[in-house]
C-alpha cells in the first residue's frame, strides 16, 4: 500500500511539481497581502501532497533543482525545524523502525520540499514586498526629496522674497528717515526765518517808535517855544520882522542921542537897550532853531544880499570887527590891542565852528550813502532805511548846537566890544553895524527891483 502510494506520489510529484513550480511567479507586484495568500495556498498543496505521498527519488530530483537548492541553502534553519517537527509527528504512526525510517525520510524530504517551496514562496513574497517596498520607499523617498527640494526651494524663494521685502522695507525706512530729517531741517529753517523776521519787525517797530517820539519831541518843542507856534518858520519870520522894526526904533533913538550929544549916563542907557535888543533876536533864533534849524541856517528870513554874507545863521564876528576898526578911529593903543585880540579869538572860534560844520556835513553824507542795498520792498530794506534815518536824525540834532554856539560867539563879541570901547564909541559902533546891514537890505531891494531887461 505504501509502495503504491509512493509510486503514485512519485508520479504525481514527478509530473505535478514542474507544473507547480513553473506556475509560481518570480516577482509578485501585488504586495504583501498577495504573497501571504499564495503562501497559504501553497501550504495547502503541501499538506495534500503529504497525504498522497512522494518517492525519495522525487525528493532527490527536487533537490537537484537550482531553485530549491538556493532556497534550502538560504534557509537551512527553517527546513531543519520543519523536518524535525514532521518526524516527531509521523514517527508514532509506524509499527516498525526500519519501515518507519524510509517513510520518515520520505516525509522528511516531502516536508523539506513543501517547507522549501513554502519558504521559497515566502521568500519570494518577502522579496516582492521588499522590491515593492523599496520601489515604494524609493518613490516615496524620491517624492519626499522632491517635496523637500520643493519645500527648500519654496523656503529659499520665501527667504529671497523676505530678503527682497526686507531690503525694500529697509530702503523705504531709510527714505522715510531721510524725508523726516529733511522735513525737520525745513521746519527748523522756517522757524529760524520766522524768528529773524520777528526780530526785524521788532527792530523796525522800535525804530518807528523812536522816530515817532523824536517827531513828537520836536513838535512839543515847537509848541512850547516862545514866539514860535506850530508854523515855526512863518512865526519866526513874523517875529523877526517885529524885532527889526523895534531895532530900527532903538537905532533912531540912539542916533538922536548921539547927534544931540546926550550925557554919558543917558547914552549908556540907550546903548544898553540896543544891546539887550540884540540879545532878544538871539533868543528868538534859538527857539526857531528848535522848530526848524534848516530855516534859520538857510537865512530865508533875511534879504538875498544878507544871505550872501551869512555864516551859520548870522554875521561873522571877525568880519564885523574888521569893519568897525576903521569906523571907530581914533582909538588908543590899548583899545586897538583889545580889538585885535578880540578879532583873533573870534576868528579862531569861527574856524573851529566851520570845521565842525564841515565834519558834520561829511559824516551826514556818509551815513546816508553807506547803506547796504537790499531787495526792494523787503523787511531788510525798510530796517536799513529806518536805521539810516535814525542816525541822520541824531546827527542833525547837532546842527542846532552849532547854530547856538555861533550866536553865542556873536553875542559875546558884541559884549566884549562894549567893554573895550567907551560909551560914545559903543554907540557909534552900534550905529555903524546897523548902517552896514541897512545897506545890504537896500542892495537886495534894488536888486529885486532892477529892470527885467537886464535879466536876459
From Swiss-Prot:
InterPro entries: bZIP (IPR004827), bZIP_sf (IPR046347), TGA_domain (IPR025422)
GO CC terms, sorted: nucleus
Subcellular localization: Nucleus
Alphabetical GO biological process terms: DNA-templated transcription
Region (Disordered): 1-41, 115-170
Annotated stretches, region: Leucine-zipper: 194-208
Amino acid composition bias (Polar residues), ranges on this chain: 9-41, 125-141
Region (Basic motif): 168-188
Keywords from the UniProt entry: Activator, Coiled coil, DNA-binding, Nucleus, Transcription, Transcription regulation
Gene3D superfamilies noted in UniProt: 1.20.5.170
Biased composition (Basic and acidic residues): 158-169
Name of the molecule in the record: TGACG-sequence-specific DNA-binding protein TGA-2.1
The species this protein was found in: Nicotiana tabacum
Gene symbol of the encoding locus: TGA21
Amino acid at each position: 500500500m505504501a509502495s503504491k502510494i509512493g509510486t503514485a506520489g512519485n508520479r504525481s510529484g514527478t509530473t505535478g511539481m514542474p507544473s507547480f513550480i513553473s506556475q509560481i511567479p518570480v516577482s509578485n507586484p501585488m504586495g504583501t497581502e498577495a504573497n501571504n495568500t499564495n503562501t497559504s495556498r501553497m501550504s495547502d498543496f503541501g499538506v495534500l501532497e503529504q497525504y498522497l505521498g512522494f518517492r525519495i527519488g522525487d525528493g532527490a530530483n527536487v533537490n537537484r533543482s537550482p531553485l530549491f537548492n538556493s532556497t534550502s541553502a538560504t534557509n537551512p534553519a527553517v527546513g531543519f525545524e520543519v523536518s524535525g517537527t514532521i518526524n516527531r509527528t509521523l514517527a508514532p504512526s509506524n509499527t516498525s523502525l526500519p519501515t518507519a525510517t524510509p517513510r520518515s525520510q520520505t516525509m522528511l524530504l516531502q516536508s523539506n520540499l513543501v517547507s522549501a517551496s513554502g519558504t521559497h514562496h515566502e521568500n519570494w513574497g518577502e522579496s516582492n514586498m521588499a522590491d515593492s517596498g523599496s520601489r515604494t520607499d524609493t518613490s516615496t523617498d524620491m517624492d519626499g526629496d522632491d517635496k523637500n527640494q520643493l519645500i527648500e526651494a519654496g523656503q529659499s524663494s520665501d527667504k529671497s522674497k523676505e530678503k527682497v521685502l526686507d531690503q525694500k522695507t529697509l530702503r523705504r525706512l531709510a527714505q522715510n528717515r531721510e524725508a523726516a530729517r529733511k522735513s525737520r531741517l525745513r521746519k527748523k529753517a522756517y522757524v529760524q526765518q520766522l524768528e529773524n523776521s520777528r526780530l526785524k519787525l521788532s527792530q523796525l517797530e522800535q525804530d518807528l517808535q523812536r522816530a515817532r517820539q523824536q517827531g513828537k519831541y520836536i513838535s512839543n518843542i515847537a509848541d512850547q517855544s516862545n514866539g514860535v507856534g506850530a508854523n515855526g518858520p512863518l512865526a519866526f519870520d513874523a517875529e523877526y520882522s517885529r524885532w527889526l522894526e523895534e531895532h530900527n526904533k532903538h537905532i533912531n533913538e540912539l542916533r538922536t542921542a548921539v547927534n544931540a550929544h546926550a550925557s554919558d549916563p543917558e547914552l549908556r542907557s540907550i546903548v544898553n537897550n540896543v544891546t539887550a535888543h540884540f540879545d532878544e533876536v538871539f533868543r528868538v533864533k534859538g527857539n526857531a532853531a528848535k522848530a526848524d534849524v534848516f530855516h534859520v541856517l538857510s537865512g530865508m528870513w533875511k534879504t538875498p544880499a544878507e544871505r550872501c554874507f551869512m555864516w551859520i545863521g548870522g554875521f561873522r564876528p571877525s568880519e564885523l570887527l574888521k569893519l568897525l576898526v576903521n569906523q571907530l578911529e581914533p582909538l588908543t593903543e590899548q583899545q586897538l590891542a583889545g580889538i585885535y585880540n578880540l578879532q583873533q579869538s573870534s576868528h579862531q572860534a569861527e574856524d573851529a565852528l566851520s570845521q565842525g560844520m564841515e565834519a558834520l556835513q561829511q559824516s551826514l553824507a556818509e551815513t546816508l550813502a553807506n547803506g547796504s542795498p537790499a531787495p526792494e520792498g523787503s523787511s531788510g530794506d525798510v530796517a536799513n532805511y529806518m536805521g539810516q534815518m535814525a542816525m541822520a536824525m541824531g546827527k542833525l540834532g547837532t546842527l542846532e548846537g552849532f547854530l547856538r554856539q555861533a550866536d553865542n560867539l556873536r553875542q559875546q563879541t558884541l559884549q566884549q566890544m562894549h567893554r573895550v570901547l567907551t560909551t560914545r564909541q559903543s554907540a557909534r559902533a552900534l550905529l555903524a553895524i546897523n548902517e552896514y546891514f541897512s545897506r545890504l537890505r537896500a542892495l537886495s531891494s534894488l536888486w529885486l527891483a532892477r529892470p527885467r531887461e537886464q535879466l536876459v
